[in-house]
């Protein structure tokens, strides 16, 4: 009778310990979600600071020092004081003169991005990118930009934009916003530098559309990685020392009894 009670209490203790470890396991914080207060992406809610995407008098689909699809020191679809990756108002991509200057002046890559993508398996760390991994290839998302011109432009030029994103493990970020912001920056930068070194330039419209497309892909990548991260964590909890010791003790007691 006494052994039966002891076995019952050990079983309760085992379940309680396993549950407590499961709830206490560290996981990335949601950060309030998209556009729901707190530090948000784009812009991280910091007026006057570096905002992403570039804010030049209007947000997505609004005037940007001149309406989208209208002249802005050069019509959309044409170089804007020099194409992307070339002099642009006194500075090229990453050379100042634009909101992307914080990335620093890029050096010419020694390896074509497509070659890197072909050689690296999805989820593998890409050499030379500081621990970033290359995600799986995705179908480019269906996005409406608020006007017929940009919707049509995206349909006709979507092949020019990335179908894979660069990211770091989810446990290195405090919330989804930070991972997505970093993912967009590195992916757009790598794709732009690689493309411009081949003699192709991106217009303002290209950059606006590409940032939106990559952002959506980074969100999808985050969701996939978070799910996999939680599943790995659940498996690790089951075989962590406290539950295993309690389970062995319970089995020994039942066998002896």
Swiss-Prot record:
One GO location term (cellular component): side of membrane
Prodomain residues: 235-257
Biased composition, class Gly residues, residue ranges: 55-101
InterPro entries with a match to the protein in the record: Prion, Prion/Doppel_b-ribbon_dom_sf, Prion/Doppel_prot_b-ribbon_dom, Prion_copper_b_octapeptide, Prion_N
Residues the entry annotates as binding Cu(2+) 2: 72-74
Record-listed Cu(2+) 1 binding positions: 64-66
Keyword tags: Amyloid, Cell membrane, Copper, Disulfide bond, Glycoprotein, Golgi apparatus, GPI-anchor, Lipoprotein, Membrane, Metal-binding, Prion, Repeat, Signal, Zinc
Signal peptide: 1-24
The keyword Lipoprotein is annotated on this UniProt entry: yes
Pathology linked to this chain's protein: Found in high quantity in the brain of humans and animals infected with degenerative neurological diseases such as kuru, Creutzfeldt-Jakob disease (CJD), Gerstmann-Straussler syndrome (GSS), scrapie, bovine spongiform encephalopathy (BSE), transmissible mink encephalopathy (TME), etc.
Domain notes for this protein: The normal, monomeric form has a mainly alpha-helical structure. The disease-associated, protease-resistant form forms amyloid fibrils containing a cross-beta spine, formed by a steric zipper of superposed beta-strands. Disease mutations may favor intermolecular contacts via short beta strands, and may thereby trigger oligomerization.
Protein name: Major prion protein
Annotated organism of origin: Mustela putorius furo (European domestic ferret)
Lineage summary: Eukaryota, Metazoa, Chordata, Craniata, Vertebrata
């Amino acid at each position: 009778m006494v052994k039966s009670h002891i076995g019952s209490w050990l079983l309760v203790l085992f379940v309680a310990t396993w549950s407590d470890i499961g709830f206490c396991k560290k996981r990335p914080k949601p950060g309030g979600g998209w556009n729901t207060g707190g530090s948000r992406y784009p812009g991280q809610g910091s007026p006057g600071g570096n905002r992403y995407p570039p804010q030049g008098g209007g947000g997505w689909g609004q005037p940007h020092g001149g309406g989208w699809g209208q002249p802005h020191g050069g019509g959309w679809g044409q170089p804007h004081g020099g194409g992307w990756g070339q002099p642009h108002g006194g500075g090229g991509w990453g050379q100042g003169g634009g909101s992307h200057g914080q990335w620093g002046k890029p050096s010419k890559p020694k390896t074509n991005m497509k070659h890197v993508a072909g050689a690296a398996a999805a989820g593998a760390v890409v050499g030379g990118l500081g621990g970033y991994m290359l995600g799986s290839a995705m179908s480019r998302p269906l996005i409406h930009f608020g006007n017929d011109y940009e919707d049509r432009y995206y349909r006709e030029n979507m092949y020019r934009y990335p179908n894979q994103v660069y990211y770091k493990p989810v446990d290195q970020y405090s919330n989804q916003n930070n991972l997505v912001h970093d993912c967009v920056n590195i992916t757009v930068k790598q794709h732009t530098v690689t493309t411009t070194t081949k003699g192709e330039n991106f217009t303002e419209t290209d950059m606006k559309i590409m940032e939106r497309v990559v952002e959506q892909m980074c969100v999808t990548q985050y969701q996939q990685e978070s799910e996999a991260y939680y599943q790995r964590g659940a498996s690790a909890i089951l075989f962590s020392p406290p539950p295993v010791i309690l389970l062995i003790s319970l089995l020994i007691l039942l066998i002896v009894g």
